[in-house]
Structure formats: structure tokens, C-alpha cells
């Protein structure tokens, strides 16, 4: 008896079962597609390119051939609290994000790299609206967006070698409030979900 589900065919199942049991919940603040992944283990028809901005954006990246493969090399999953904290620490240790001027293009590149290498669906890096400091909606992500001081902007735009297309020279064109923002690490964001306190309306379905 046993057929195709005999003992020999389920080698490794205990490890898979244990991995499923230990699967972490999605972090507070991730998007609808990540909630699908958490609940069903896949993105369902309730989140498609037609009705979900993150799905539509990802599909567009795949069509554009953005410079590296956009199909993840690991299983697709939602961003978790622990993963967001660990990723924040990794980027802080490696450098490169702290004080970097934010632009949508730079955020897209970061999201795609994380999606490709870690499998986290790119609907987790969202922030509270401005003006002023923008706090991450995803609990555990320890980078906030902070307006750059006018003096620092003035200094950065001096000289003939300034690129007009550099985010610091675009004077906040990416931002609804026309503020130039930079990523800033804040260790307290691992313990204090500021976005949830400021905007509880964003978390009604969490």
C-alpha cells in the first residue's frame, strides 16, 4: 500500500513541516499582496496587476529588464518583523543607505534587490505622509525619511560638477510635499511603531 505517498517519497517532510510551523507572521504595515502570502502562501487573484499597485510595478520591472533578474532566487514571502530588523542592521553595517538622498528610483532598486536576493515581496517599504519626517509603516524597518536641511542642500548644489539629475538637485520632485528626503537609521523604530500611533487608520486591516 502507500502508493506515491510512501515513506520514501516524503523524505524531508519533517524539515518542511518544521519550517512551516516556524514561519513568521508578516510584519505590521506590509501591503495586501504580502498579507496574501502570509495567509495563503501565494499571491491570490485578489491581488493582481490590475488592482494592486505593487503587483503592477513588479510586472513592469519584469518587462523592462531592469539590469538583474527580478525573479527571486528564494521562495516568495512577506516581510517579517525579524527580517526588517535584520535587514536594517545589515544595511547599517555595510553602509550606503544612511544619509543617502531618497528618490523613488533608488527605493525601487533597493526593493528589487531585496526581492531578488531574499524573496520579500516589494510592498513593505512604505512611509507615513509628509510634510516632515516620514516613518516606516512596516514595523521593524529602522529607516525613516528625514527632510534635508536647506544649508546642506545649498552646499550639495554648489559647483559646476553638480548633476542636474541627481536626487539632491531635483528639489523634491518625487515628493508630494516637494521636500528632499534622506534615509536615516533610527534604532528606536524596532521597539516603537511610530507610524501606527500617528496613523492608526492605515492598520485597520492588519
Swiss-Prot record:
Keywords noted in UniProt? AIDS, Apoptosis, Early protein, Host cell membrane, Host Golgi apparatus, Host membrane, Host-virus interaction, Inhibition of host adaptive immune response by virus, Inhibition of host autophagy by virus, Inhibition of host MHC class I molecule presentation by virus, Inhibition of host MHC class II molecule presentation by virus, Lipoprotein, Membrane, Myristate, Phosphoprotein, Secreted, SH3-binding, Viral immunoevasion, Virion, Virulence
Q: Name one GO molecular function term.
A: SH3 domain binding
Lipid anchor positions (N-myristoyl glycine): 2
Q: Where is this region: Acidic?
A: 62-65
- Map out region (Mediates dimerization, Nef-PTE1 interaction) in residue numbers: 108-124
> The motif Dileucine internalization motif: which residues?
164-165
Region of interest called SH3-binding, as start-end residue ranges on this chain:
69-78
Compartments reported by the entry: Host cell membrane; Virion; Secreted; Host Golgi apparatus membrane
One GO biological-process annotation of the entry reads: symbiont-mediated suppression of host antigen processing and presentation of peptide antigen via MHC class II
Q: What induces it?
A: Expressed early in the viral replication cycle.
Region of interest called Binding to ATP6V1H, as start-end residue ranges on this chain = 148-180
Which residues make up the annotated site Might play a role in AP-1 recruitment to the Nef-MHC-I complex?
A: 20
| One Pfam entry name | F-protein
In its keyword annotation, does this UniProt entry include Transcription?
A: no
| A GO cellular-component term linked to this record | membrane
User: Record's domain comment?
Assistant: The N-terminal domain is composed of the N-myristoyl glycine and of a cluster of positively charged amino acids. It is required for inner plasma membrane targeting of Nef and virion incorporation, and thereby for infectivity. This domain is also involved in binding to TP53. The SH3-binding domain constituted of PxxP motifs mediates binding to several Src family proteins thereby regulating their tyrosine kinase activity. The same motifs also mediates the association with MAPK3, PI3-kinase and TCR-zeta.
How would you summarize the oligomeric state and partners of this protein? Monomer; cytosolic form. Homodimer; membrane bound form. Interacts with Nef associated p21-activated kinase (PAK2); this interaction activates PAK2. Associates with the Nef-MHC-I-AP1 complex; this complex is required for MHC-I internalization. Interacts (via C-terminus) with host PI3-kinase. Interacts with host PACS1; this interaction seems to be weak. Interacts with host PACS2. Interacts with host LCK and MAPK3; these interactions inhibit the kinase activity of the latter. Interacts with host ATP6V1H; this interaction may play a role in CD4 endocytosis.
So what family is this one in?
Belongs to the lentivirus primate group Nef protein family.
This protein is called Protein Nef
Organism expressing this protein natively: Human immunodeficiency virus type 1 group M subtype B (isolate HXB3) (HIV-1)
Encoding gene, per UniProt annotation: nef
Amino acid at each position: 500500500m502507500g502508493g506515491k505517498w510512501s515513506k520514501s517519497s516524503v523524505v524531508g517532510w519533517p524539515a518542511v513541516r518544521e519550517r512551516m510551523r516556524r514561519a513568521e507572521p508578516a510584519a505590521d504595515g506590509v501591503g495586501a499582496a504580502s498579507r496574501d502570502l502570509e495567509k495563503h502562501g501565494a499571491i491570490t487573484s485578489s491581488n493582481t496587476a490590475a488592482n494592486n499597485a505593487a503587483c503592477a510595478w513588479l510586472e513592469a520591472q519584469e518587462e523592462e529588464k531592469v539590469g538583474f533578474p527580478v525573479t527571486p532566487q528564494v521562495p516568495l514571502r512577506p516581510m517579517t518583523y525579524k527580517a526588517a530588523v535584520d535587514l536594517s542592521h545589515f544595511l547599517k553595517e555595510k553602509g550606503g543607505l544612511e544619509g543617502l538622498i531618497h528618490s523613488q528610483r533608488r527605493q525601487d532598486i533597493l526593493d528589487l534587490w531585496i526581492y531578488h536576493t531574499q524573496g520579500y515581496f516589494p510592498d513593505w517599504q512604505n512611509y507615513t505622509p509628509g510634510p516632515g519626517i516620514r516613518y516606516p509603516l512596516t514595523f521593524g524597518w529602522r529607516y525613516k525619511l528625514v527632510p534635508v536641511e536647506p544649508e546642506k542642500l545649498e552646499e550639495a548644489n554648489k559647483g559646476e560638477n553638480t548633476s542636474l539629475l541627481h536626487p539632491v538637485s531635483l528639489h523634491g520632485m518625487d515628493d508630494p510635499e516637494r521636500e528632499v528626503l534622506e534615509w536615516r537609521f533610527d534604532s528606536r523604530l524596532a521597539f516603537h511603531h511610530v507610524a501606527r500611533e500617528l496613523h492608526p487608520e492605515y492598520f485597520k486591516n492588519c
